[in-house]
Amino acid sequence: MSKLKLNPYFGEYGGMYVPQILVPALKQLETAFVEAQEDDDFKAEFTDLLKNYAGRPTALTLTRNLSPNPMVKIYLKREDLLHGGAHKTNQVLGQALLAKRMGKKEIIAETGAGQHGVATALACALLGLKCKVYMGAKDVARQSPNVFRMRLMGAEVIPVTSGSATLKDACNEAMRDWSGSYEKAHYLLGTAAGPHPFPTIVREFQRIIGEETKKQMLEREGRLPDAVIACVGGGSNAIGMFADFIDEPSVELIGVEPAGKGIDTPMHGAPLKHGKTGIFFGMKAPLMQNSEGQIEESYSISAGLDFPSVGPQHAHLNATGRARYESATDDEALEAFQQLARCEGIIPALESAHAIAYAVKMARECTKETILVVNLSGRGDKDIFTVSDILNGKEV
């Protein structure tokens, strides 16, 4: 078997901690990805799908009423306008094309909020691939609109009842399935985490977010933003925004983890700042674990951020200080969800609302002219019933 072509680590984080049976499949995937990145026909087809199917470039919207500070402009990178309703569509189209290139006939995926599942289902429908999606039973219950969308597009949705019945358990089941079917199936991982080469593949297929943002900012403002802000669960929307700005030292990179019921409670999903390094989901990364090293259940109001670990490149950016990671509570995200709807007529995903919440807080504290860009990673249609139940009939 050939040597790895890409560095599997980001500093001390990352790697390929998987059963031996999966190593050939991961090496095959890495080789196919490297070859595809050098193939002009592959890149042209991917670019065409992003433009003429998914609807790129997405808008960069200057908010009119959201900023609490006249010195601060808050822009939104509108991934909510992408076909499928979230940033997930970008990298799913890339991986699905890669799977076809490798001769795979079936796609296995996991999903939390259902957005990755929907994106996978639409890509499989488009490209004629069989689709199987693992989803925690709790998430199936709280994300019923997305479950219906997946099934409507021909996907088989498999509820996972083991463990906490959420995203981490869906990930485990999907990986287990792939262990026995990798010769015919591709595991289409939904975030910039997991074993090498997934964190790199997902970043490269998502980096269009930051590339477009940089170009649009230079056109609109004649300069780069002071900070780009994105929510962080596994971290794909954030790494997509950050990737093209990492080498721009004037631009602050800010990730926002879910503080849930409070960082000082067990009910959160913020392993970057409040976890310990461990091995999970095929990678070495910060992980929520107890004193005995067992994985603790993460918690967030938003299913897509309800994950006990985080992508290895985010761990490295945090360790080196290149990016800063903050957090927002359920209550802060709920307030931001309503605030954006009221102020701008845009209903964000609860995941994205965490980033909005931090941006508004940051804007309030700025003492000079500042430009912030928030990655509005998805739309909030999927969350309206959850939010309605929580507000319990209160006037929104």
Curated annotation (Swiss-Prot):
The superkingdom of the source organism is Bacteria
Q: Which reaction does it catalyse?
A: (1S,2R)-1-C-(indol-3-yl)glycerol 3-phosphate + L-serine = D-glyceraldehyde 3-phosphate + L-tryptophan + H2O
Q: Which CDD domains match?
A: Trp-synth_B (cd06446)
* Signal peptide (from-to): none
Keyword terms: Amino-acid biosynthesis, Aromatic amino acid biosynthesis, Lyase, Pyridoxal phosphate, Tryptophan biosynthesis
Question: Does this UniProt record's set of keywords contain Amino-acid biosynthesis?
Answer: yes
GO CC term, one of those recorded: cytoplasm
Q: Where are residues bearing N6-(pyridoxal phosphate)lysine located in the sequence?
A: 88
List its EC numbers: 4.2.1.20
Which InterPro entries does this entry report, sorted A to Z? Trp_synth_b_CS, Trp_synth_beta, Trp_synth_beta/beta-like, TrpB-like_PALP, TrpB-like_PALP_sf
Q: Look up the record and name the cofactor or cofactors this protein needs.
A: pyridoxal 5'-phosphate
- State a single Gene Ontology molecular function: tryptophan synthase activity
KW Endoplasmic reticulum (keyword) present: no
The pathway noted for it is: Amino-acid biosynthesis; L-tryptophan biosynthesis; L-tryptophan from chorismate: step 5/5
Q: How does it assemble?
A: Tetramer of two alpha and two beta chains.
Q: What does this protein do?
A: The beta subunit is responsible for the synthesis of L-tryptophan from indole and L-serine.
What is the similarity comment for this entry? Belongs to the TrpB family.
> Which HAMAP family does the UniProt entry name for this protein?
Trp_synth_beta
Q: In its UniProt entry, what is this protein called? A: Tryptophan synthase beta chain
Q: Which organism is it from?
A: Shewanella baltica (strain OS155 / ATCC BAA-1091)
